[in-house]
Design a protein with these regions (language model features):
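Extracellular/oxidizing-compartment recognition motifs
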Residues: 23-106, 110-521, 528-529, 545-546, ...
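Alpha-helix capping and helix-loop boundary segments enriched in small/acidic/polar residues
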Residues: 174-181, 218, 226-230, 241-243, ...
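C-terminal capping/lid segments that line or modulate ligand- or cofactor-binding pockets
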Residues: 253, 321-322, 522, 540, ...
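Non-catalytic C-terminal accessory modules of carbohydrate-active enzymes
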Residues: 273, 277-286, 297-330, 334, ...
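Alpha-helical support elements that line or immediately flank enzyme active sites
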Residues: 199-203, 213, 391-410, 453-458, ...
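Bacterial Sec-dependent N-terminal signal peptides
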Residues: 1-25
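Active-site acid/base region of carbohydrate-active enzymes
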Residues: 208, 300-307, 460-502, 508, ...
Length: 926
């Protein structure tokens, strides 16, 4: 119960500032972000959480002040908006309704609330938001070393490894100018002669950039800006600077550029070739002085550039660095740049400039060497202890001109050397020494999925061979998106605990600019993983600002005919079912609804409803009598066959069920949004698809769907396609197949969620327990027994390519919703009301989870002890929960030691409690 004690302690610390009987607004957000620097909406939504020492606390009214300065806000002068007292319990997504907001302007706000007893709170702490500029305000000029026309880079998105040979690849490389893919440094001196109040930087460096002011890095991002389809959207980043970032007199802006996904043409391994142009920079800085004057420094023809010491950089192939090409102090004043060249004005990317509102990728963890083996003299293989996405940091000592090559990989060959055959080769990092003591280097523009590092022709630690350089130190940097974690889970079952860890290490490894399939071979945003793992992702990570960016990418990638491609951004067109598979494309329909359910925010439904309709309409054009027959089906379903296309279940059954689900959710969205005509259209369409599906795939005599596979029977139950009178019979067929298979699954990437949740939602959690509580394949336990630290692409790692895939991680939903019992209420989105209904299965003695909802922390922690079932729960202020207890109807139930008034759910056959906010201990006799 240690985790729950920590939760209680954190909650207690938060409310110590609140006196008895009071309530306090905390964690103020604008457009779901704390103090955002680039709000696009001119009527942004304001939200806050609430804390209180007392139970059953709620809000009955609020008052918001928005001011043009912190000074005015301190004086309670809401010169931009004074909402007055508004009587409502709503504390999320309050639409700003004050004076028109100005672009490139910062505003400050605070709120106070009244509780259920009519007592008013103290003012919250101040929060702020800055309105983004229009693209016309930015008036961007793009600069670099070479124009796109002079680069001779290939156009198009069909060049990939399956269709490419080395000669064709080399012909493209030879035809292009080497400067078009070279990392460059750009610098711009400027003067500051007055006292600076603040400065705001708007920057986009494509593919990726590193920004310095006077030699000091600005921000902590890696691989900024985040990936987009640069023909449709180009992200820019915003930074606030203060007077301490400048010095009186001469100052210098420095920018380092790399290729990223913007320009993947390169030697060595690459999954595909795509080039939107050579590296390019847009920069604008607005400096405000204390005297009220302003100054603009922006990218133009006065900037200079030079080749950087990064002599090779490829998002797929690695990175090389020659320290002898360093130019010390190039980003600071006093540097002589007479040998630098003037930049050229470049053709602007085609995409619309948009502020990056999703969180950046950063270095989140660092790992030391776990073990090292010297396979032969001066030939070392290092185990870093964790498979991850990232890059190494090396410290070396040697003579000028000596070089070190760092190979990385997920696994090892039989002889103990690194194995890149499955994950894309060759991939490595080269560093050439300048011979100046101990030198430290960290790559900047390339990452890979790896656990093992191989380095040849070196001394390690001690300089035994004077002719070789010495590796002094080695570390692994784990990079992933900085969105932050939203939940935690643990239980008495060690297989489940380690499974949770495996899955989350894989999620983190693939949580980059987009959710990728793997961090080495492809690094592509295959869509199905997001929606099929959606609830598990939501419970574990804060995706409030990430998913809107995902939907923008989906919108950008949607074709004119309505097709949503399987990969987003669609850097490469693989064609056929790998471009057009309904289970992947329907993500554009499912995600806005899932976002609404978890965050209580309908903005994605409102904004992307046309996208949803257009995709369902597209599937209608692909159907015959409402049956859709194309796609990948239940990809990688399990059996004796080779993994790939669905073999156990009809592809048409899979495609048509997702066509139905898309129409069904589009109808629900239309109803919510008050679009009556659309609701009637898609409600009718969903009904017709359902009828056609049952006519085509259901056998009324055997009560089986399709091939009677686990996928075939679970999908219609999950989606409520099966007619009610047949549901139990279909369930029995499903259970019979599971039993026949020895309580093992046969579903794949698509089917796992439907199988798991069909069992969980229909009282078969014991079956789920047996299905996963073992060390055999198919099963998570087999990968644990195999000694892996991340989830793999196939249940048997020896058969798959990637050892860092989260596509099979759908059990996370079961951990949180069933074992811990935290379940949302679709009728009260955002967990305004929710259920806590833990399932006690197998020989488990405890389970616990917490989830940071938009209203605050939700926690559930149960244990079986001394003949009692003890459940501890935390319910956020301004919410309510229904507790469903896994005990008999006549069990004695106490809350905090006192006998409780208990209801009973005939449907679930469980005693129930209705509770308001607070922390409670519930005891039941077993």
């Amino acid at each position: 119960m240690k985790n729950f004690k920590n939760i209680v302690l954190a909650f207690s610390l938060l409310v110590t500032v609140v006196s008895k009987g009071q309530i306090l607004p905390v964690r103020l957000t604008t457009e779901m972000a704390e103090n955002p620097l680039a709000v696009v909406e001119n009527k942004p939504k304001l939200s806050w959480q609430l804390v209180s020492k007392e139970s059953n606390a709620s809000q009955v009214a609020y008052l918001i002040l928005v001011a043009s300065s912190e000074e005015k806000l301190k004086m309670d002068d809401g010169d931009i908006w004074n909402s007055g007292r508004v009587n409502t319990d709503k504390n999320l997504h309050i639409v700003y309704s004050g004076k028109p907001l100005k672009n490139e302007t910062k505003y400050f706000w605070k709120v106070k609330v009244w509780n259920q007893a009519g007592k008013v709170s103290k003012w919250s702490r101040n929060a702020s938001f800055r309105i983004a500029p229009l693209e016309s305000d930015l008036n961007p000029t793009w600069i670099g070393a070479i124009t796109k026309a002079d680069s001779h880079l290939p156009e198009g998105r069909t060049y990939h490894t399956a269709t490419f040979n080395r000669e064709k690849k080399n012909s493209f490389i030879n035809a292009s100018d080497s400067l078009s893919r070279r990392s460059i440094m750009l610098r711009k001196p400027f003067e500051v002669e007055k006292a600076v109040k603040e400065a705001v930087v708007y920057i986009s460096g494509l593919g990726h950039y590193e920004l310095t002011i006077n030699g000091k890095k600005v921000g902590n991002s890696q691989f900024a800006p985040l990936w987009t389809d640069y023909d449709k959207t180009v992200n820019y980043n915003v930074y606030e600077l203060s007077a301490r970032d400048f010095q009186k007199g001469d100052n210098v802006i420095g920018v380092l550029l790399g290729n990223g996904m913007y320009n993947t043409l390169a030697e060595r391994y690459t999954k595909f070739f795509v080039s939107f142009g050579p590296p390019t920079l847009f920069f604008k800085m607005k400096i405000k002085y204390n005297d009220g004057s302003e100054e603009i420094v922006k990218s133009d023809g006065t900037w200079k550039y030079s080749k950087s010491p990064i002599t090779y950089n490829s998002i797929f192939g690695g990175e090389d660095y020659n320290a002898n090409f360093e130019q010390k102090g190039w980003g600071s004043k006093g540097f002589k740049d007479r040998d630098w060249k003037k930049v050229v004005i470049q053709e602007a990317p085609k995409g619309v400039l948009r502020p990056q509102t999703a969180p950046p990728v950063t270095i989140q963890k660092q790992y030391e060497v776990k073990t090292v083996k010297e396979l032969k003299p001066n030939f070392y293989v290092f185990d870093m202890g964790q498979n991850l996405s990232g890059f190494p940091t090396i410290k070396v000592k040697g003579e000028r001109g000596q070089s070190i090559r760092v190979w990385v990989a997920e696994g090892l060959n039989e002889e103990g050397t690194i194995a890149q055959g499955r994950s894309g080769k060759p991939y490595y990092y080269d560093y050439t020494l300048k011979g100046d003591g101990v030198e430290e280097w960290t790559p900047k523009f390339s990452f890979y999925g790896y656990q093992y590092v191989q380095i040849e022709n070196i001394n390690y630690k001690d300089a035994k061979n004077k002719d070789l350089l010495t590796l002094v130190d080695l570390k692994s940097n784990f990079i992933y998106n900085s969105a932050g974690e939203a939940g935690s889970f643990a239980c008495s079952n060690e297989i489940f605990n380690k499974t949770h860890e495996l899955i989350n290490n894989s999620i983190k490894s693939n949580f980059q600019s987009v959710f990728t399939d793997c961090p080495q071979r492809e690094k592509l945003g295959w869509l199905e993983e997001i929606q099929l793992n959606g609830p598990g992702l939501m419970f574990n990570y804060n995706l409030q600002n990430f998913l809107p960016a995902t939907m923008q990418n989906i919108s950008d990638s949607q074709r004119e005919n309505g097709l949503i491609p399987s990969i987003v951004p669609e850097y490469i067109i693989f064609g056929g079912d790998f471009t057009d598979s309904p289970e992947w494309g329907v993500t554009g329909v499912i995600l806005p609804w899932m976002y609404y359910e978890y965050y209580g925010d309908a903005s994605l439904l409102e904004k992307y409803f046309p996208i949803m309709k257009k995709y369902v309409d597209y599937l209608e054009t692909k159907s015959t009598n409402h049956i859709v027959s194309h796609g990948l089906g239940d990809w990688y379903d399990y059996g004796t066959h080779a993994a790939g296309y669905s073999k156990n279940s009809p592809i048409a059954l899979s495609a048509t069920s997702h066509y139905y689900y898309g129409a069904y959710l589009t109808a629900k969205a239309a109803k919510l949004l008050g679009k009556t005509e659309d609701y009637e259209k898609y409600e009718t369409l969903a009904s017709e698809i359902k009828t056609a599906f049952n006519r085509e795939f259901f056998n009324p005599e055997t009560k089986q769907y399709g091939t009677n596979s686990q996928f075939s029977n679970s999908v219609p139950v999950f989606m409520n396609i099966v007619e009610p009178q047949y549901k139990e019979a279909v369930m029995q067929n499903l259970l019979a197949d599971i039993k026949e298979k020895g309580d093992r699954l046969t579903t794949g990437d698509v089917g796992n969620r439907y199988l798991f949740q069909t069992l969980a939602r229909n009282g078969e959690n014991e079956t789920m327990y047996r299905m996963h509580n073992h060390y055999d394949a198919p099963g998570y336990g087999f990968q644990i027994k195999f000694g892996l630290t991340t989830l793999t692409e196939q249940w048997d790692p020896r058969k798959g390519n990637s050892w860092n895939h989260f596509m099979l991680g759908q059990i996370e939903e079961w951990f949180f919703q069933s074992l811990a019992g935290i379940m949302s209420d679709p009728e009260k989105p955002g967990f305004k009301h929710f259920f806590i209904q833990p399932e006690v299965v197998g020989d488990m003695t405890f389970a616990k989870a917490d989830y940071e909802s938009v209203y605050g922390k939700i926690a559930s922690s149960w244990e079986k002890k001394d003949g009692k079932f003890i459940l501890k729960v935390q319910i956020p202020v301004n919410t309510k929960a229904t507790i469903k207890l896994p005990v008999s109807k006549d069990s004695e139930i106490k809350i905090d030691g006192k006998k409780a008034g208990v209801g009973y759910s005939e449907k679930d056959k469980k005693p129930t409690l209705e509770l308001g906010s607070g922390i409670y201990t519930i005891e039941c006799k077993l």
